[in-house]
Amino acid sequence: MSYSNILVAVAVTPESQQLLAKAVSIARPVKGHISLITLASDPEMYNQLAAPMLEDLRSVMHEETQSFLDKLIQDAGYPVDKTFIAYGELSEHILEVCHKHHFDLVICGNHNHSFFSRASCSAKRVIASSEVDVLLVPLTGD
């Protein structure tokens, strides 16, 4: 089976390059499309900050996340069609984006080594609820 519209869930970590490389290896032979989704930290979890500071911090975090995605795309050696930066529960956003944009494969990474950690990760929630195929890629740290 070939996949032509792939969504890659990345984190702002170097291991995300492995996920994008996997997506490129799947998409390139069929000239498929790749999009990225990531989660930006929500500064509201730092509730001791005043409201005006929260908005400034949210803007900075969004810019840093976008810069990371831009660098990841630049190094990919293959075009990336869309990027999505989500706030909140990543698995919910992945499912929503898949439905709206008709992705046929979601690629997620897993660097958790214990069974308990794997059972509680966002990827498990995506796998349980997804209407499209999900590829869980084991990640190796540098």
Curated annotation (Swiss-Prot):
Q: What is its main location?
A: cytoplasm
Indicate yes or no for the key word Nuclease: no
Name the keywords, alphabetized. Answer: Cytoplasm
Which subcellular locations apply to this protein?
Cytoplasm
Pfam families recorded = Usp (PF00582)
> Which NCBIfam families does the record match to this protein?
PRK10116.1 (NF007512)
What is its induction behaviour?
During growth inhibition caused by the exhaustion of any of a variety of nutrients (carbon, nitrogen, phosphate, sulfate, required amino acid) or by the presence of a variety of toxic agents. Positively regulated by guanosine 3',5'-bisphosphate (ppGpp) and by a RecA/FtsK-dependent regulatory pathway.
Keyword Cytoplasm set for record? yes
Q: What terms describe the molecular function in GO for this protein? A: molecular adaptor activity; protein homodimerization activity
Which source organism? Escherichia coli (strain K12)
Give GO terms for biological process: cellular response to starvation; cellular response to UV; response to salt stress; response to stress
Q: Which GO terms describe its cellular component?
A: cytoplasm
Q: What does this protein do?
A: Required for resistance to DNA-damaging agents.
UniProt cross-references to PANTHER family, sorted A to Z: STRESS RESPONSE PROTEIN NHAX, UNIVERSAL STRESS PROTEIN C
Name used for this protein in its record: Universal stress protein C
**Family statement:** Belongs to the universal stress protein A family.
